[in-house]
Amino acid sequence: VAPAFIGRDARELETLVNDVYVYRSNYKYQGTPFWNCVAYLEASLFDMLGRAAGRSVGDLIGGAWRSEIPIYLSSMRRDTTPEEEVRWVGERLAETKAKAVKLKVGGRMRNNEDSVPGRTERLIALARRTWGDGLTLYVDANGSYDHGKAIEIGRQLVAHGYAWFEEPCPFEQYEETK
């Protein structure tokens, strides 16, 4: 995607982003990998424009809304027992003082099974019981479930006060995700 930006006026950012989609038939490569590349270039151009103007990127796009951004701790592990995961994440929480945690659930990409049998259901309850209501909890299933299992897990998450359920069904299955 970079060649579509070379030699062009960075101040015309909206036009550049629109044009890159059709440049050399880039539209054939639509999807996350393509748009991630565009986003990296767009962020770099915003940074360059801000430096040239001696202003923050926030100022360039209408003013900063906050001076601090809350972070969450994200675990990428699925091969642990709930007890191992809560202990490991708890150590990271003590180090980082994060106010939220995102845990991995399911077996990844729709097989309705955990890598450790029963892990998801036990982890959902154990994490909330261990950390209480003062910590915001999220889960990411990476498309682990069909719609029936996703609804079942979603109800457990609601019952335990989780804030979000990321990608319960495979992302390309729009009907099941509804």
Give each language-model segment a name:
Residues 1, 16, 37, 41, ...:
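Generic hydrophobic, aliphatic-rich segments that mediate packing or membrane embedding
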Residues 1-52:
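Metal- or metallocofactor-binding catalytic centers and their adjacent structured scaffolds
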Residues 3, 7, 59-63, 67, ...:
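Generic structural "secondary-structure junction" signal
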Residues 14-20, 28-30, 60-61, 96, ...:
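Short hydrophobic/aromatic-rich motifs at helix boundaries and adjacent loops
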Residues 36, 42-80:
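Glycine-rich, aromatic-flanked loop segments that form ligand/cofactor-binding clefts
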Residues 67-178:
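Metal-dependent enolase-superfamily TIM-barrel catalytic cores that perform enediolate-based chemistry
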